[in-house]
Amino acid sequence: MNAAAEAEFNILLATDSYKVTHYKQYPPNTSKVYSYFECREKKTENSKVRKVKYEETVFYGLQYILNKYLKGKVVTKEKIQEAKEVYREHFQDDVFNERGWNYILEKYDGHLPIEVKAVPEGSVIPRGNVLFTVENTDPECYWLTNWIETILVQSWYPITVATNSREQKKILAKYLLETSGNLDGLEYKLHDFGYRGVSSQETAGIGASAHLVNFKGTDTVAGIALIKKYYGTKDPVPGYSVPAAEHSTITAWGKDHEKDAFEHIVTQFSSVPVSVVSDSYDIYNACEKIWGEDLRHLIVSRSTEAPLIIRPDSGNPLDTVLKVLDILGKKFPVSENSKGYKLLPPYLRVIQGDGVDINTLQEIVEGMKQKKWSIENVSFGSGGALLQKLTRDLLNCSFKCSYVVTNGLGVNVFKDPVADPNKRSKKGRLSLHRTPAGTFVTLEEGKGDLEEYGHDLLHTVFKNGKVTKSYSFDEVRKNAQLNMEQDVAPH
């Protein structure tokens, strides 16, 4: 086998080991397995444990998985042989379903006889509703539905990043509106600093793209190519950045030359926004003496379009932001906006990019509001918390079988563990509907076929190896927009 073939993705090896044995475990004469994915509600969770509730989720990322891993001819003679050899050693037994995979190769030229129905990408759906369903389209391939659970459930990651990012957008929108009267610049208030903090290059692309569903600022370049390739945008790029300093470009000048470093950098980038990390030695001295006195003349002459953005990067995030604002407020002319909140001059802003997660973000904007500082003055950078400090458990992302056909008879199936009612699964064929009141409802046991519920919001996105429906990134963003009354209005 040549190196290229060896490196090629093999869906036969992209499943949990135990699934290799499941074709032997279903009831005899099973001809259909139908499963669904949801972000389960946690009805019995102690609300004190978690500050953020995450009552709704942003559905995003399935389109990437379908296009990258499942469409087209994904089964070949070589891949079957490779899997056969691996599993023979892995299980120390011949348990691999060689016959089943050969059937797919011969009858469908290696295309998967599967249908996936899903809500539109970017949809914001309350927890506990069906998000996508999966079923085999050939009765011989009943075992295939849950074989691909493993790769499909990895959509938990983009869903969770997009959801968490959107919840932070709600917080920022609420406080920006309260302290300024408008939402100008909202989509640049939370910048992705997470590239180095994620587990892999692929994670970076997926996670960054999920954040860009809600915002437009990113330093994780990998997200741009993924969006362009798998979604497409009307804009040349979906995310933007600005020139910025890191500690090395400051400390390389030496401890006694921080002022020279600052001066050089703001001069190099005089007509665009520039962010300068200012805590290499003493953030407060930097703000008061260097920016506030020594280089003040270079800052006040900058335009509204090219502000200096001072970046603290250590200490308690709330205390640091407030103290930096306080110092800058004494050194530069502060105005009061229409809402009565303090505003730095347009050529000067602050970005907090250290220790920012959804909880510290809430604390910082609340602290600023109490001290009468407008949120217009600041933006935030988040890295590990935005892209990596998340698990499948945060939104309880789960994939379960709800319907099977055995001996020609359809049976609604479910699990309902005695020790955890939260793990009860749905029964039968599922559909998602809008009620007349505008809320979402999942209908179980095929009841969505009854006309009074209106059309099903699940659309076929994949069938027999083909992606049948795609969404542009602009559509995804539109679907995920904040609802001004619901999400932003003061509660």
From Swiss-Prot:
EC number: 2.4.2.12
Broad class of enzyme this protein falls into: transferase
Pathway terms, separated by semicolons: Cofactor biosynthesis; NAD(+) biosynthesis; nicotinamide D-ribonucleotide from 5-phospho-alpha-D-ribose 1-diphosphate and nicotinamide: step 1/1
Residues binding diphosphate: R196, H247, R311
Modification N-acetylmethionine, positions: M1
CDD domains per UniProt: PBEF_like
GO BP annotation list: cellular response to amyloid-beta; cellular response to hypoxia; cellular response to ionizing radiation; circadian regulation of gene expression; circadian rhythm; female pregnancy; inflammatory response; microglial cell activation
Any GO molecular function: heterocyclic compound binding
Tissue expr: Expressed in various tissues. At the highest level in liver and at the second highest in heart. The amount is higher in heart than in lung.
Main subcellular location of this protein, as a coarse class: nucleus
Keywords per UniProt: Acetylation, Biological rhythms, Cytokine, Cytoplasm, Glycosyltransferase, Nucleus, Phosphoprotein, Pyridine nucleotide biosynthesis, Secreted, Transferase
Binding site for beta-nicotinamide D-ribonucleotide: D219, R311, P312, D313, G353, D354, G384, R392
Residues recorded with modification Phosphotyrosine: Y188
GO cellular component: cytoplasm; extracellular space; nucleus
Catalytic activity entry: beta-nicotinamide D-ribonucleotide + diphosphate = 5-phospho-alpha-D-ribose 1-diphosphate + nicotinamide + H(+)
Modified residues (Phosphoserine): S472
Subunit and interaction comment: Homodimer.
Record family assignment: Belongs to the NAPRTase family.
NCBIfam families (alphabetical): PRK09198.1
Functional note: Catalyzes the condensation of nicotinamide with 5-phosphoribosyl-1-pyrophosphate to yield nicotinamide mononucleotide, an intermediate in the biosynthesis of NAD. It is the rate limiting component in the mammalian NAD biosynthesis pathway. The secreted form behaves both as a cytokine with immunomodulating properties and an adipokine with anti-diabetic properties, it has no enzymatic activity, partly because of lack of activation by ATP, which has a low level in extracellular space and plasma. Plays a role in the modulation of circadian clock function.
PANTHER family referenced in this protein's UniProt entry, alphabetically: NICOTINAMIDE PHOSPHORIBOSYLTRANSFERASE
Protein's UniProt name: Nicotinamide phosphoribosyltransferase
Taxonomic source organism: Rattus norvegicus (Rat)
